[in-house]
Amino acid sequence: MKIIGSAFLGIVFCILLAFAIIFGIEIDYYHQGDYLKYLNFLDKLHQYNKIDNSFEYSNHYESALIGVIVLTIICFLIFITPIIIIVITKIKEKKVINKKI
């Protein structure tokens, strides 16, 4: 039960961390007035559509949401890997104990 609780808290933490990183970067670029850097950041963050040799930018909250989702998945995988390793070792230990008995 503790593992499930810590995994849930880890997921929540990863989502909040991703929101803070993405929106923090976007707001920082926007308020600095460095719009070229801001638009370059948006280009890297989401895929843009090429229509008649012109680029159509989507809403920056949309692009930030895509960044949040990607960062959340990465953070979640980093967080969940040790938990999976611990669970696997506990299962192996139980199998070894059962074989000895």
Curated annotation (Swiss-Prot):
Q: What is this protein called?
A: Uncharacterized protein UU127
The record gives the membrane topology as: Multi-pass membrane protein
Keywords attached to this entry? Cell membrane, Membrane, Transmembrane, Transmembrane helix
GO CC annotation: what is one?
plasma membrane
Annotated TM spans: 3-23, 68-88
Q: Specify where it is mainly localized.
A: membrane
Species of the source: Ureaplasma parvum serovar 3 (strain ATCC 700970)
User: Any idea where this protein resides?
Assistant: Cell membrane
Transmembrane helix in keyword set: yes
